[in-house]
Curated annotation (Swiss-Prot):
Keyword set includes Cell division: no
GO cellular component: cytosol
Protein name as catalogued: DNA mismatch repair protein MutS
Binding residue positions for ATP: 632-639
Length: 872
């Protein structure tokens, strides 16, 4: 802090206290509790004033300069905290823990928790239908000898969902995989090792936190995690052979412990997430398919926007996780599909969805209970959720059988009622509790005898005061007399100043107002002491009982977490069933054998956005027909056709029904898309460079089990360069990689490849022309397109007629010119064994580089020259 002096003696005692606390949190905003406000000082105040648009004032002086100060009301702090967290700031909450009445100096204060973007659990600070993750990464170039390697994996990554307790590690093999993971997780906060070699991988991420190298120590991480999970080794979690992932997990967990300053009982395990368990989606594919975010950064017109009709927030979050991590496990996928079928067949959608809506967000409520930050209404919501479970079980009974393959039975078993916990919460919490415990009125009557006695004494004050007022009116004859109370002066008897002349001698003046006088009697004073003492004891006891309630719920934590997971999964599968019926989806057949066969497939999003009937189209990719060259006019539907194929394949790999009349989907290992591009100005890359980078990633990483979508490869450069690149890419994918490929192009020359490569076929989207008007048919047909209709599309776009006319003239001239054949000789498979985007050196060049001409005789030099000439 630039404005604080090292010598604290010149400051007031309170400011010395503040500066001491601030020194522990130099990079964190301090919310310093003073009465009914949280105050910020010095640079914190200036920063908060700018970010929150609050007034910047001053308090006292230091070194002759006024101390900047800004503050927010205690009761409205959550709104300001939410804004700061959304902006990536961390805030330390410093509370008064001492009693102002007994404090000789400043009231004792301490930081009770640190709120960071990735560790928040408060309901008001979270988006309810979106995961909020904190991630830690380390690379294999760490100075730590146990982490430093020259081979894959290249990175260790761990992530934690504080609001659910999900703790996961993985080890990305390459920088591309790391970027894909970060895009999938979209962390609110990212911890990274100070030794990270390539900062450009994360520099555009928000919530960056640089951590010292020692926090990634492997031995410390293992010890820390064993202690948390109460184990002697981590073998049972399947992570003991993941040193980089464990190092990242250790750093992350220590950071969370330091910020939360409390036990973390809801973090009960760590899971290893392996890429080979799922369908790999790189960053470009996630973006191009618009899974949860559209190309403009919004949420509209995405796959999630169409599918997510979940009844609970936790179901919505799980659905999005499934979209970003499609699986290759046929057992899991068939379980999901069969459960969707059961829900439809048993007509469970209508009765189940209203019950699910009443369950709320059990997952995050349980997390807040584990962290000790749950509010009274969290307990009330949990109670309400538990009260719905018996009826939910009754509805599921029709789907329960003894068959071990009935996954619906498994879900039902994991969501059994919890009558004891339900009974505890019914007994302990009033029907409609207040927001906070501080004002009391949370614990239900009958829960604790001592509390009931104090409550009766406190509540009886009103009746006593009414009786006293009536007696005093009769005794004094002053009928305007009133008995009242306020927090400053306590109980009093109030009357007009005129009437006060005739008060009895036992009336003691307590306060004089402009028109009234206030008095107290010995009887009223004794009652005041008794009532205030009862109220104080009542509040203290109620807070104590409330804290004990946390401890009583904790033994059920594991079952509650299992319950929340089961309910979330049931919610997603019920949503899949509802969407299947509402949108006319079918159950795809998932098979091990490679291939994609789709009858009358439709685009999930586009068919919901268009007012016209969507034209359904087939897709057939087999071992004998691995690549489709797709031609046709702009706006003809090529990109839509390719995207809908990828989305149908992806939906099948999350266990969802698909928009088609029939579909058989073989398991794929990766989905790649190279569709559309724009300049990456932040990295200084042109559109063509972005296109080639994405293409290179596909050519290096696709396999014969991958689905590849390529749209207009080579369009960003000259015609011949672009055509040559497109041609070579198509040949490599067809002959060497042998991936299932949809290759859209305007280079009609590529259709000639079908005559050379037996596994390649041409399809096209046609259009009809009538009187210079064009009608797009949007129907996929076998064979190559007859023309591109580029001029007609330009005319539709409003290009001036004079330009269109001149273009037609020039087109006619070009078509009449003699164009030499560009069809090369058939290529052999082994031509791609050493394919690289770097130019290969000719053997002549290699020989010349390796030859020392000073050592050659004239005869040897002449022989070498003849030899080199023969190689040309």
């Amino acid at each position: 802090m630039t404005t604080a002096t090292k010598d604290l003696s010149s400051h007031t005692p309170m400011m010395r206290q503040y500066l001491t606390i601030k020194a522990e949190f130099p990079h964190t905003l301090i919310f310093y509790r003073m009465g009914d406000f949280y105050e910020l000082f010095f640079d914190d105040a200036k920063k908060a004033s700018d970010l929150l648009d609050i007034s910047l004032t001053a308090r006292g002086k230091t070194g002759g300069n006024a101390i900047p100060m800004a503050g927010v009301p205690y009761h409205a702090a959550e709104n300001y905290l939410a804004k700061l967290v959304a902006l990536g700031e961390s805030v330390a909450i410093c509370e008064q823990i001492g009693d102002p009445a007994t404090s000789k100096g400043p009231v004792e204060r301490k930081v009770v928790r640190v709120i960071t973007p990735g560790t928040v659990s408060d309901e008001a600070l979270l988006v309810d239908r979106q995961d909020n993750l904190i991630v830690a990464i380390v690379d294999n170039q760490s100075p730590n000898a146990k982490l430093k390697t020259s081979s894959a994996p290249a990175f260790g990554l761990a992530y934690l969902d504080m609001a659910s307790g999900r703790f996961v590690l993985t080890e990305p093999q390459t920088a591309e995989q790391l970027q894909a993971e970060l895009q999938r997780l979209s962390p609110a906060e990212l911890l990274y090792s100070e030794s990270l070699q390539d900062f450009s991988l994360i520099e555009q991420r928000k919530g960056l936190r640089r951590r010292p190298e020692w926090e990634f120590d492997l031995d410390t991480a293992i010890s820390l995690l064993n202690k948390q999970f109460d184990t002697k080794e981590l073998t049972g979690f399947g992570v003991d052979d993941k040193p980089l992932g464990l190092a990242a997990a250790g750093c992350l967990f220590q950071y969370v412990k330091d910020t939360q300053r409390t036990a973390l009982p809801h973090i009960r395990a760590i899971v290893c997430e392996s890429a080979n368990k799922g369908v790999v989606l790189d960053a470009a594919t996630r973006r191009n398919l618009e899974l949860t975010q559209n190309l403009h950064g919004g949420l509209d017109n995405t796959l999630a926007a169409i599918l997510d009709k979940s009844s609970t927030p936790m179901g919505s979050r799980l659905l999005k996780r499934w979209l970003h991590f499609p699986l290759r496990d046929l057992t899991v996928l068939n379980n999901r599909q069969n459960t969707v079928s059961d829900i439809i067949a048993l007509d469970l959608i209508a009765p189940i969805q209203p019950l699910l809506k009443g369950l709320g967000d059990i997952e995050r409520i349980v997390s807040r209970i584990a962290l000790g930050s749950a509010r009274p209404r969290d307990f009330a919501r949990l109670r309400h959720a538990l009260q719905q479970l018996p009826e939910l079980q009754n509805e599921l009974k029709s789907g329960l059988t003894e068959s071990p393959t009935n996954y619906l039975a498994t879900i039902a078993q994991q969501s059994q009622p919890m009558p004891q916990l339900e009974g505890l919460l019914v007994h302990a919490i009033v029907e409609n509790p207040p927001v906070l415990i501080r004002d009391g009125g949370v614990i239900a009557p009958g829960y604790n005898n001592e509390l009931d006695v104090l409550r009766d004494l406190s509540d009886g004050a009103t009746e006593f005061l009414a009786q006293l007022e009536q007696r005093e009116k009769e005794r004094t004859g002053i009928h305007s007399l009133k008995v009242g109370y306020n927090r400053v002066h306590g109980f009093f008897i109030e009357m007009s100043r005129t009437a006060a002349v005739d008060v009895p001698d036992d009336y003691i003046r307590r306060q004089t107002l402009k028109n009234n006088e206030r008095f107290i009697t010995e009887e009223l004073k004794q009652h005041e002491e008794k009532v205030l003492s009862a109220q104080s004891k009542f509040l203290a006891l109620e807070k104590s009982l409330y804290q004990e309630l946390f401890d009583k719920v904790l033994p059920d934590l594991a079952q509650l977490q299992q319950l929340s997971q089961a309910i979330a999964e049931l919610d997603v599968l019920t949503t899949f069933a509802e969407r299947a019926l509402a949108l006319n989806y079918v159950k795809p057949s998932l098979v091990e054998e490679p291939g994609i066969s789709i009858d009358a497939g439709r685009h999930v999003v586009v068919e919901q956005m268009t007012n016209d009937a969507f034209i359904a189209n087939p897709v057939l990719l087999t071992e004998q027909r691995k690549m489709l060259i797709i031609t046709g006019p702009n706006m003809g539907g090529k990109s839509t056709y390719m995207r809908q194929t990828a989305l149908i394949v992806l939906l099948a790999h999350i266990g969802c029904y698909v928009p088609a009349d029939n579909a058989t989907i073989g398991l794929v290992d990766r989905i790649f898309t190279r569709i559309g591009a724009s300049d990456d100005l932040a990295s200084g890359r042109s559109t063509f460079m972005v296109e080639m980078t994405e293409t290179a990633n596909i050519l290096h990483n696709a396999t014969d089990k991958s689905l590849v979508l390529l749209d207009e490869i080579g369009r960003g450069t000259s015609t011949y360069d672009g055509l040559s690149l497109a041609w070579a890419c198509a040949e490599m994918l067809a002959l060497k990689t042998k991936a299932f490929t949809l290759f859209a192009t305007h280079y009609f020359e590529l259709t000639l490849l079908a005559g050379q490569i037996s596994t390649l076929a041409n399809v096209h989207l046609d259009a009809m022309e009538h009187d210079d008007n064009i009608v797009f048919m949007h129907a996929v047909q076998e064979g190559a397109a007859s023309k591109s209709f580029g001029l007609q599309v330009a005319q539709l776009a409003g290009v001036p007629k004079t330009v269109i006319k001149r273009a037609k003239q020039r087109l006619s001239e070009l078509e009449q010119q003699q164009t030499p054949s560009i069809l090369p000789a058939p290529i052999q498979n082994d031509a791609f064994e050493q394919l690289s985007f770097a130019p290969e050196e000719h053997s002549v060049v290699t020989t010349l580089i390796d030859t020392d001409i000073n050592e050659l005789s004239p005869r040897q030099a002449l022989d070498l020259l003849f030899s080199l000439k023969e190689q040309l």
